Amino acid sequence: SLRPCLAYLLASAQEPLNGDSLASDFRYLVKELAATHPDPYSGFGGKVFFYEQAFHLENELRRTPGTKQTFFDKVSIFLSNLQDGHTYLLPPTANQQANQRYLALEVRTIPDGIILQGIPETYKDLLGSRITTINGDSLEEVLARTAAIQASENLYDRYANLCRSMPTEHFLRQLFPEMKDNLHLSLLTPDGKSRGLTLPLLSRQEVQNTPMQHNNSWKAYTDKQLAYQFIDNDKQIMLININSIMARDNFEYMQKQGLKDLY
């Protein structure tokens, strides 16, 4: 797992940064990647192509004025070739993205899909609806674009990255360069009806002031070895939380030794 924290990243997301410094940081990343990653080359088509892409990006960073945000975007695209969800850059923090806008929206992954987990109270009848298209594009198309800009090693990673980043304006504009100031979702409701939902981009404060309605979900992490919780009112869907799995032999040995409080 490689999650580099480079010194310049304390700067504002939009503060212009020295090109030589950006190139130097990226060169360091490439060196560490080649030295520590179990397979840094295959996703690029081989060692030669890995270094070829690294060379071009380093030169681009050196000659083109950039910010923390543009550095993050370009290097994330480079790292996405690894198809490794454990190797990525941490994005700029919210405090460093003063002008960032958001959707009043929370989504979550289900098997082969994404559903609405939290939305403004005005649309609470749409909670739990499955997203079928985003701004007119199929979920498959959007997932493919997500994989091209954020490292993901499998389909679940793509879903997770999309769910985590979808409420942020910067990510949405990477997916939809022609996007206006709102996002349109085509939905399939739990009772099988086709509906649409258009949400505007809002400031962080506006999102915080928006009354939201949420689906039931796992309420909190627990320190119990094994715990479960129903997430629907009919008690048909359960979440199970297992903190760790111990070998049976360990318990049998301790039991034979007369030790108590094993569970």
Residue map of PLM features:
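Flexible, low-complexity junctional segments that flank or bridge functional domains
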Residues: Q14-Y263
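Bacterial Sec-dependent N-terminal signal peptides
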Residues: S1-P16, L29
